[in-house]
């Protein structure tokens, strides 16, 4: 059976810009009161037909730079890499229209609860959440992620900011004065409480806490030698509790992602395979035509 073609280029990096320039400095009231042109863009396209079972969605990323292969959802710093890994792991915490984290959402992979009076954030792992190797996601994974963020030996860490110093004991840990972060408590197998010295309004926008979770065993292995950190499985072959996992990679060019069989909402994943491929601006028009 002949398969229908998928859209070859689909990227949030590809957008149409409209520039409106006003040149007159006149006080003419008719100019000031003139109605503004209304410009509308379609955000969805329906090409008709039905989905092809087992087909692969082609996802183009418009970029002049290649993929670096850093697939860590926290420490990845290149936009093209994060375009891939962000779609693979999905969101750990849901947000509202203002991009503020939603509290007490039982359906999230990890539930977020802020207690301003106690200056605490409680993270609760969803009971059905599993890594792509079938093992449970636990409180130990959350604690390990924070310990990696503040690890004093991780000199190349570009993600650590002063906002993390508001976690009790984090600065001492980050400065090498303590072996553990005193303000982080593993309450039970699924719950972690993070104590702060101060709660700022920006905390609801993700400042001062980590918006994803890494696998504790992979963190432990990667932390043994930070001179080889970039090549660790934590970054090259990270376990995922999101909708997809990395199945194949062509260095610098493309990534094939397949549906995670252990995803806690696997019935919601309708597209079973996605091929992410970097498309240079010079090639974009020819790729769309084909």
PLM ranges: what are they?
Residues 2-26:
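Sec-dependent N-terminal signal peptides of Gram-positive bacterial secreted proteins and lipoproteins
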Residues 32-57:
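N-terminal low-complexity, Pro/Thr/Ser-rich intrinsically disordered segments
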Residues 61, 247-258, 275-290:
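Extracellular/periplasmic solute-recognition and catalytic clefts
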Residues 23-35:
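Bacterial lipoprotein signal-peptidase II cleavage site
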Residues 208-269, 273:
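Gly/Pro-rich hinge or "lid" segments in bacterial periplasmic/extracellular proteins
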Residues 58-116, 239:
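N-terminal lobe/hinge region of extracytoplasmic solute-binding protein
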Residues 110-160:
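Aromatic- and charge-enriched surface segment that lines or borders ligand/interaction sites
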Residues 159-221:
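Surface-exposed binding/hinge segments that line
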């Amino acid at each position: 059976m002949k398969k229908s073609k998928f859209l070859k280029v689909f990227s949030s990096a590809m957008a149409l810009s409209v520039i409106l320039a006003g040149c007159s400095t006149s006080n003419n009231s008719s100019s000031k009161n003139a109605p503004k042109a209304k410009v509308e863009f379609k955000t969805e396209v329906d090409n008709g037909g039905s989905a092809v079972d087992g087909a692969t969605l082609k996802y183009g990323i418009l970029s002049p730079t290649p993929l670096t292969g850093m697939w860590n959802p926290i420490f990845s710093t290149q936009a093209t890499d994060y375009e891939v890994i962000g779609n693979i792991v999905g969101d750990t915490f849901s947000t509202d229209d203002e991009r503020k984290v939603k509290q007490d959402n039982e359906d999230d992979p990890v539930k977020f609860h802020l207690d301003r009076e106690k200056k605490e954030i409680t993270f609760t792992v969803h009971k059905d959440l599993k890594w792509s190797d079938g093992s449970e996601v636990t409180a130990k994974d959350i604690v390990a992620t924070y310990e990696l963020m503040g690890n004093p030996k991780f000199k190349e860490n570009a993600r650590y900011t002063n906002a993390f110093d508001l976690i009790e004991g984090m600065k001492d840990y980050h400065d090498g004065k303590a072996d553990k972060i005193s303000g982080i408590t593993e309450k039970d197998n699924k719950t972690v409480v993070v104590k702060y010295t101060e709660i700022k309004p920006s905390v609801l926008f993700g400042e001062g806490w980590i918006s994803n979770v890494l696998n504790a065993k992979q963190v432990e292995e990667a932390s043994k030698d930070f001179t080889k950190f970039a090549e660790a499985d934590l970054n090259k072959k990270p376990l995922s509790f999101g909708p997809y996992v990395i199945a194949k990679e062509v260095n610098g060019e493309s990534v094939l992602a397949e549906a995670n069989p252990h995803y806690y909402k696997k019935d919601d994943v309708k597209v079973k395979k996605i091929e992410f491929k970097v498309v240079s601006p010079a090639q974009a028009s020819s790729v769309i035509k084909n």
